[in-house]
Amino acid sequence: MKINKYNSLVFAVLFGFGLSGQAQTKQWTLEECVRYALDNNITIKLSELDVKNAVIDKRGALGNFLPSVNANASHSWNVGLNQNITTGLLQNSTTQYSSVGASVGVDIYKGLQNQNTLRRTKLAIIASQYQLTKMQEDISLNVANAFLEILFNKENLKVKKEQLAIDQKRLARSEEMVNAGTIPRGDLYDLKATAATDQQAIIVAENSVLISKLSLAQLLQLKEFTDFDVIDDTDIKDENNIMAQTPIDIYNKAKETRTELKLAQTNLEIAERNVIIAKGAFQPTLSAFYNFNTRASYSDIITGSTLNTANPTRQIGYVEGTNQAVLEPNYSPVLGGAAPIFDQFNDNKGQSFGLQLSVPIFNGFSVRNNVEKSKVSLERSKIDLEQKSLDLQRNVYTAFTDAKGALNAYESSTVTLEARQQAYNYAKEKYDVGLMNSFDFTQAQTLLTNAQSEVIRTKYDYIFKIKILEFYFGIPIIPIITK
């Protein structure tokens, strides 16, 4: 089942690229591939959004220095037995009230937390930019690796096709020699088997080319990749003379330029700032406030009074000694409509302002725990920076050793290829005059093909290892890797 799925994938890739055979294929250079990836890769776009978030956080930190201003308004209905605030009487009625207000508050002192928070957000912007740069560098290396993989597979396919062409010519000549009785028919069968093996090797090599193209196209986030191809613009020469540097020189340069160290150092500074912010919560806070409010009622108001004709007097007491009733005129209030709302707002307005001091005494160890947690994070950041430095040193020395080994392997493979070519030429001369059988000649040919493939492999392996070493030395894959 797994084999069938793999074959289906290969067929789909072959079909997709095959349809474009008649179209004009664009050949991409390494620089074009890297720049396109930097502009379109999803991971890089996410890192760019992180930078934008960090900038927004900085604006929020600046806002902490500004006063907070809030306005409020309300309108309410009271239904049922309520006291009329105008007459003071209890009555069943529906009354309405409106109120508006505003408040202003500003922090005067908050343990310098606002200042330190602003400094932290500035560091966070730098850290997010370093993270974006690191992502760009990683994508550049991945693109370069995938690009060189395509070049290797294309060169390998070229060797396989050239070998098939040679075998087909030799097969045609061998048929003539068999017909002439110069060589036995068994040699002809061996050559046919060799040609068939060459055909199979070409199919495998073509699949490798197409799959490597697909891998790079996906890395570039290409929506249409059927016409995708690359052109070899690489050079085996060490143009920057990087191999003349010592590992310690490369490491010292890397400590100055490598983004992962800058990012770890910035994260350490952020952790230090977090400790200071957490300690600021131990200090008292002082703030100022100002409040304004006013209200209005929609109830009727007393506009005057009139004598109650039904009960013109009312008793208010007795004369001591005679118990004579003391009476006064009984007036009833005359109610009018509610006062104009804006007049009420103007008459009923009130203000309050002052200072508020808050001294932390005990908060369930929350402040102390936050300080301890921030200190743990600080220690973690210190260890991370130290680990990043050790990793960088190991990676530089490993990259230098790999590049040196790749160069030696490439030089050795070229010497081997030269020897295999001479051995093949000698075997061909002997085979052509009947002094060597087809089996031994095929062995010489196979060794030559393997030597050619090894030269190609070591060539592109060396180019990539040099790219990595230059990368640690501060030389980017392309001149400018940022947008």
Question: Which sequence ranges carry the predicted segments?
Answer:
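Sec/SRP-type N-terminal targeting helices
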Residues: 45-49, 62, 94, 108-136, ...
